[in-house]
A protein has these predicted regions:
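Conserved catalytic cores of very large enzyme subunits
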Residues: 2-748
Length: 748
């Protein structure tokens, strides 16, 4: 056994990469309370104070502090970088994306036009030399995609029935198992990949075999470059980490290699708390670490995650507002044996929100079960109430599918750590698809014949029997063009923007999932309900085109625990997912879908016309799986019950639900509020629901923040939105108004 593995137990993980087995053999669960936690050290306060000042400067400059224009980002493109002059000794975790804090790298491999536009948007002049290289000599992902797009694909993209496609930015959602760097050292990982290369292709050299051999070689090169990057900071990561500080640093170098080479829409950290706790506990036993020092290590690691930045273009920022990176980091959960996997370090990660205040990043995610230790549930609820910075996902529905060593690879999507990768698929606008079923495929905004020219509804009333066959046909068409478009995008991403650093830390024999998504979900449900249970009259313009709907009579709405509406919701999810499954998916990946919109529900709504449920043209779509605005009439619990009916097995990419609760609705004091929130989550997740964003504040606070963003208390005021967290002052005015328009529950 290597000297770095002293004190560790188990044998199965010694000779092959087996992170789960190592964790199961060595972690100590913790059932106690939060009284052991320590306040920030002097070094933490000083560094975080410097970063807060840099964030103020960044905001004053319009959202970007500094941007690279002359150097193409790579693992070794820069020398060592630190938070400030003379802070090297203060930083217990080192490493920056560039040479300066909050400076955004130049990443042209996804698309040179986008990289240059990101520069010019904020007043920076891109390099003429790099422009020549990436237009004449080096093809990019974006160029490859648009070279191969069919006219139909361009048409659906232009008309926004397929939205947010990863054809102008890195796809993200690939989580390298960064723990491997710490446990095994990079030399061991190189040797394992070299074995895979030797065993690949002993026979016919098919296209797939040739491509895989090239990819493994690229992964080996990435691992070697990872060592060079660490050496720039004075570290040798060839061998395993020797203590907790090294384990955290080694792991961070793995993550840093990813964010230096990719600008994916989600660059998740993964499930690291239990793993790191093993090293911290060993250091405690050896007498080389105190609790204050352990918390400082976690604080400094989280500080680095809070600093991750990418250069983005305006159209991207409209879709994903507030500068998110989805450095998603999970805590808690149960083992396959039913035992709690909560450790002291799970508390420590949540405690960073107290030591350094609220923050959108990392995207802290509690893998929730009603069987988690009471003290941990209470502490998580306490932090949610005070910071609105945590999301919760149901470990009891994910664990049977993904095991007990999975990560969240984006907003809410699970992936088995080190074993799987996901092809990100953005969203199909089913709300617009519904209007196409009525108009015969003609877009209400552009008047293009975007969808198939099926026979429109020609009468003055939308009848259920006339509408449903048309809607089914239109969804079938949309599912087909959606999958084909994504197949093309991911082929080109693999070819021109391959994630070698991340995939080097994932098994070569990787399982791939093919993510799709649904936008406008609740509006489609309520519109079908209106057509079925009420009378929907069509109002036409002078050309006879259906421009508006007038609904007579009442109809059940999703979000009120009414099975008449909720059954339609379940039907819609199952039907669309089954349509997706009919089609061939790239590299034999397994299709999934999500009900998730991010903040792009505002942009999607702009391009969507009037709907039978009463939603006006141009208004934001309801986010994720949330009920339509104004639909919830029976309180929070009824709304949660409706969402809980959606079957997770048909939406393995995730079902996002965001709720805002008035503090007074939870109770009159902290103890009551914590108890009530834990009770709500226990009941919600025991019903099989997948996800919950928890915001605890009143609308008055949002309005005051919008009107007075200069107040110090609002500098890091964080809220949960569909799939992530964001500083409220970083949203556009339009998006702020959208958040304010959503229901803040004043009662259960």
């Amino acid at each position: 056994m290597k000297k770095e593995w002293r004190g560790f137990t188990g044998t199965k993980w010694l000779d092959e990469v087996n992170m789960r087995q190592f964790i199961q053999d060595n972690y100590d669960s913790y059932d106690g309370d939060a009284s052991f936690l320590e306040k920030p050290t002097e070094a933490t306060d000083k560094l975080w104070g410097m970063l807060k000042e840099l964030q103020k400067q960044e905001r004053a400059k319009g959202g970007v502090l500094d941007m690279e224009t002359e150097v193409v980002s790579s693992m070794t493109a820069y020398g060592p970088g630190y938070i400030g002059e003379g802070t090297k000794e203060l930083e217990k975790v080192v490493g920056l994306q560039t040479d300066k804090p909050l400076k955004r790298a130049f990443m042209p491999y996804g698309g040179i036009k986008m990289a240059e536009q990101a520069c010019t948007t904020y007043g920076y002049e891109p390099s003429e030399k790099l422009h020549e290289i990436f237009t004449k000599y080096c093809k990019t992902h974006n160029e490859g995609v648009f070279d191969a797009y069919t006219d139909e694909m361009k048409h659906v993209r232009h008309n926004h029935i397929l939205t947010g496609l990863p054809d102008t930015y890195g796809r993200g959602r690939i989580v390298g198992d960064y723990r491997r760097v710490a446990l095994y050292g990079v030399d061991f990982l190189i040797n394992e990949k070299a074995k895979d290369l030797r065993n690949c292709g002993d026979g016919t050299m098919t296209e797939e075999v040739i491509r895989l051999r090239e990819e493994i070689s690229m992964q080996i090169k990435a691992l070697k470059e990872m060592k060079e990057m660490a050496a720039i900071y004075g570290y040798d990561i060839s061998e395993p980490a020797n203590n907790a500080r090294e384990a955290i640093q080694w792991l961070y170098f793995g993550y840093l290699s990813a964010i230096k080479t990719q600008n994916g829409a989600a660059m998740s950290v993964g499930r690291i708390s239990t793993f790191l706790d093993i090293y911290i506990q060993r250091d405690f036993k050896e007498g080389t670490l105190t609790e204050a020092e352990a918390q400082e290590l976690i604080d400094h690691l989280v500080m680095k995650f809070r600093m991750v930045k990418f250069a983005r273009i305006p159209s991207y920022n409209q879709l994903f507002s507030g500068d998110p990176v989805w450095a998603t980091l999970e805590v808690a959960g149960l083992g396959m044996d039913g035992h709690s996997m909560v450790t002291r370090t799970d508390f420590r990660f949540l405690h960073t929100l107290e030591n350094m205040g609220p923050s959108p990043e990392p995207n802290l995610t509690v893998l929730y079960s009603s069987r988690l230790p009471k003290h941990f549930k209470d502490y998580a609820a306490k932090i949610s109430i005070s910071t609105s910075s945590i999301q919760y996902e149901n470990d009891d529905v994910m664990r049977p599918i993904w095991g007990d060593d999975y990560s969240i690879c984006c907003c809410v999507s699970a992936t088995q750590t080190g074993k799987e990768m996901q092809f990100f698929g953005a969203r199909a606008n089913l709300a617009k698809c519904l209007t196409y079923a009525i108009s015969g495929g003609v877009d209400s905004k552009t008047r293009d014949q975007c969808g198939p020219a099926y026979r429109p509804i020609e009468g003055d009333v939308v009848t259920y029997d006339e509408f449903m066959p048309r809607f089914m046909d239109m969804m079938e068409w949309l599912a087909g063009v959606y999958v084909n478009t994504l197949n093309l995008i991911h082929y080109m991403h693999d070819k021109y923007f391959y994630e070698a650093a991340e995939l080097a830390l994932i098994d070569t024999d990787v399982r791939r999932t093919f993510a799709t998504g649904i936008a406008g979900f609740s509006h489609v449900v309520d519109s079908i309900s209106a057509i079925k249970y009420a009378k929907v009259n069509i109002i036409r313009d002078e050309t006879g085109f259906p421009i508006e709907f007038k609904t007579e009579g009442d109809f059940p709405r999703y979000g009120n625990d009414d099975d008449r509406a909720d059954d339609i919701a379940v039907w819609l999810l199952k039907t669309f997912m089954n349509m997706i499954r009919k089609h061939h998916t790239y590299r034999n990946s397994e299709p999934t879908t999500s009900i998730l919109t991010i903040t792009s529900n505002v942009v999607y709504g702009k391009f969507t016309g009037n709907m039978p449920d009463g939603r006006p043209a141009g208004a934001p779509l309801a986010p994720g799986a949330n009920p339509s605005y104004g639909a919830e009439q029976n309180g929070l619990l009824a709304s949660l019950n409706s969402t809980a009916k959606l079957p997770y097995e048909y939406a393995l990419d995730g079902i996002s639900n965001t709720q805002t609760i008035s503090p007074d609705a939870l109770g009159h004091n902290d103890e009551e509020r914590i108890s009530t929130l834990v009770g709500v989550m226990d009941g919600y997740f025991d019903r099989g629901a997948h996800h919950l964003n928890v915001n605890v504040f009143g609308v008055d606070k949002l309005i005051d923040c919008m009107e007075h963003p200069e107040k110090e208390e609002y500098a890091n005021f964080t809220i949960r939105v569909s799939g992530y967290a964001v500083k409220f002052i970083d949203l556009t005015r339009e998006q702020q108004m959208d958040v304010i328009a959503r229901r803040a529950h004043g009662s259960m």
